[in-house]
Amino acid sequence: MNHLLSTADLKLDDALLVLDTADRMARVADAPVRKLPTLRGRTVVNLFFEDSTRTRTSFEVAAKRLSADVINFSARGSSVSKGESLKDTAQTLEAMGADAVVCRHPASGAPHRLASWVRGSVVNAGDGTHEHPTQALLDAFTIRRRLGRLDGLAVTIVGDVLHSRVARSNVWLLTTLGARVTVVAPPTLLPLGISGWPVEVSYDLESVLPKSDVVMMLRVQRERMSAAFFPTEREYSRRYGLDADRAALMPEHALVMHPGPMVRGMEIASSVADSPRSTVVEQVANGVSVRMAVLYLLLGGSGAERESS
C-alpha cells in the first residue's frame, strides 16, 4: 500500500490489516510512555486546504506518537486550491523531502493528483464530496470494538448523503467488510448515481431503525449546498432527526454514530448523542489509533528496509 486515497481501493485483507494494526496501536494509548520509535527520522506533512481541527489534530497526534517529524501546512483561499498551484505545492513538498503528505482539499480528486506528483505516500484526509477514507476506517474500527464483528451487521446511514464524503467511504468499506448498508435521506439529498451503490435506499427512518445494528447520522452540510434541499431545518429534523423516541425503536445493542461536528437538535438530539449507545467520543479516540496504523503501514520500517523492498 503506497497511498490511501479511497476505501474502494482496499481489498478485504487490506482493510483487516489496518483494523488489526489499529488494535495494536490502541494499546500504546494505555502504555506509560505513549510513543513508538517506528517513524523516527520521517517527515509527515499535514496539507490542509480546508479548515479542520479534529482531523488535522488527530493526524498530528498519530504521527508524533510514532516519533515522526510533523509539518502543518494550512492553505486558505481558492487561489491555492486548484491546478498549477497544487502542483507548485507538490514541488515544495518534494524539496522538503516529505515522506508522507496528509491532504485535505475542497476539490474531489486533488489527493489523487498530488499522489502522481510526489514520491512520498499520500493520505486522503477528505477531498470535496468524494471520500474520507480514515474516517470510514475509524468508524469500522469502533463498530468492531463495540460489537465484536462487522460481517453481517446492518448499518444505516442517515442524512445528507449527497454532500457526504464520509458516507461514500463508509459504503465502500463496510460493504467490503461484509456489512449490509442502508441509506436514509430525503430524495433531494441522495446522489443521482445511488442506484449503482451497493446499498438499499429508504425514505422512512422509523421503518429501518428496528432492523439496524448501527445508525450513523450525518451532518447537514450547509456550506456545500447551493440550493434549498429541504423546506426548513425543523421539517428536516421532524422527518430525519434521531431523537429519544426514535432511538427507542432501535435494538438494545445498536450503536449511534456521528462523524462530527454535530448539529445538536437538528440531526441528533443531545439525549441520544450523550447516551451509552453513542460512540461519538470513542470515534475521536479511535481515530488516533487508526491513523497511527495507516502511517505505520505506509511508512513503517527503516530507510534501508524500504529501499530494499
UniProtKB/Swiss-Prot annotation:
Q: Which GO terms describe its molecular function?
A: amino acid binding; aspartate carbamoyltransferase activity
Q: Could you tell me which PROSITE patterns the record lists for this protein?
A: CARBAMOYLTRANSFERASE
Its UniProt pathway annotation is:
Pyrimidine metabolism; UMP biosynthesis via de novo pathway; (S)-dihydroorotate from bicarbonate: step 2/3
Q: Which reaction does it catalyse?
A: carbamoyl phosphate + L-aspartate = N-carbamoyl-L-aspartate + phosphate + H(+)
UniProtKB keywords: Pyrimidine biosynthesis, Transferase
Q: What is its EC number?
A: 2.1.3.2
**Subunit notes for this chain?**
Heterododecamer (2C3:3R2) of six catalytic PyrB chains organized as two trimers (C3), and six regulatory PyrI chains organized as three dimers (R2).
Name the UniProt record assigns to this protein: Aspartate carbamoyltransferase catalytic subunit
